[in-house]
Amino acid sequence: MTMLRAGANITGYEIREDFAERAKKNVKAALGEKALDRYDVLIRDAYEGIEEKDFDRMVLDLPEPWSVVPHAKTALRSGGIILAYTPSIVQAAKFKEALEGNGFALIETMEVMNRTWHIEGQAVRPDHRMVAHTAFLTHARLLST
């Protein structure tokens, strides 16, 4: 949404028509009808290939992002950035391995979690319980090919 708000053109791949329609409705609700001029959701499977070229950025939220890396290599422009959300560190490690074997560099993985804090007067500490779901974000940059 932030990129659309800033004026970027966004192309998404979705294998389910109902999810594609939901995505468009969400964009319209958040940014208005005009934003849909720059937002395109294609009914395609990224595992089978990516036809478009010269993407600046690619964000992956799917079970096996490492399977898309060879396609991303041809779809991203030189210096383009790829990012994947993975719920497990094993997935993040497999994704990193695929990136290393396909010309990507500056690879970094970070864990994302949410922890609340107790702040009352001078008593400042993390809450005793943390009910959280962690996730891992791995990003890299495509080197010149």
PLM-predicted stretches and their roles:
Residues M1-G7, K73-T74:
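Conserved SAM-binding loop of SAM-dependent methyltransferases across substrates and taxa
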Residues A140-T145:
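C-terminal lobe and adjacent flexible extensions of AdoMet/dcAdoMet transferase-like proteins
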Residues Y13-P65:
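S-adenosyl-L-methionine
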Residues N9, R38-D40, A105-E108:
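Conserved beta-strand segments of alpha/beta enzyme cores
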Residues G7-Y13, I82:
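Short beta-strand element of Class I
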Residues M3, V27, L99:
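Short hydrophobic alpha-helical segments of the AMP-binding
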Residues W66-F136:
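C-terminal substrate-binding/active-site "lid" region of AdoMet-derived donor-dependent transferases
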